[in-house]
Amino acid sequence: MTAAAVDCGTNSIRLLIAEVSDGRLRDVHRETRIVRLGQGVDATGRFAPDAIARTRTALTDYASLLRAHGVERVRMVATSAARDVTNRDVFFAMTAEVLGAVVPGAVAEVITGTEEAELSFRGAIGELDSAAAPFVVVDLGGGSTEIVLGGDRVVASYSADIGCVRLTERCLHSDPPTPEEVETARRVVRERLDVALGVVPVEEARSWVGLAGTMTTLSALAHNMTTYDSAAIHLSRVPGSDLLAVCERLIGMTRSQRAALGPMHEGRADVIAGGAIEVEELACELRTRAGIDELIVSEHDILDGIVLSVAG
């Protein structure tokens, strides 16, 4: 069966088309576009017309790929930004029009933070060594961060309403961020993590797995890549000291300096400092609570979990 997943988050819209056989996936096409659907949502509570238009353009291109590859089933999920807005009906109507032209009846669905966490976990653990379990899987998005503990199943999860876009819009207004802005952002992250780690007992974890664009970009920079190489990133490992060094470097840079880095995806340079601050705080907590001082980065994530869910 050829199945597809579309994940529309606060910062990016992503597509996976895969062949599914006996519960295993073979990638046919995987793509990410930065559309910033959630731009300004934290302040206004509404999707901006320009953000809807950018998302429509990307989704139209994705629909063409679904048709070209003969996709039989597709599931599109919308996450943090869509949970928070009052005009989501405009978004739903757009997705129904674009996707429905290829797969009749297809439309985006808003999933809860709990389901987002479970799908991310399911997608991430497929190729991990079970001897390294339990895993704490962290999906750091634009508007929310999912923290999940488990081995062959989810033991505990929490969706925190903080991510690289939301943190940047709330706290990091200067270029580069001032020390005062950085400290304010750290306080916000610590407040959210205090709650999350009261629910998810990360001290039981043996391995930390990071998902999504902030994590993958940090790994690329830690490994001194001049261009982004997804095959090399998948299941790459970053020692804690290297991770913190890259985070500090990014936080101190201007947006233009970050944008000039070879592995930096277009549209991520203005928000990755917020993601780096969150990763630093996570790294410190996991080292203190669980003795974990290494990050494993996976390219397989919620998209893989969504495809598995739609393929049955």
Q: Where do the language-model regions lie?
A:
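N-terminal basic/disordered segments at the start of proteins
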Residues: 1-26
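N-terminal glycine-rich anion-binding loops that anchor highly charged ligand groups
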Residues: 24-39, 66-69
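Helical "lid/coupling" subdomains associated with nucleotide-phosphate turnover
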Residues: 3, 17-20, 40-64, 68, ...
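Conserved beta-strand/loop subsegment of P-loop NTPase cores
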Residues: 73-76
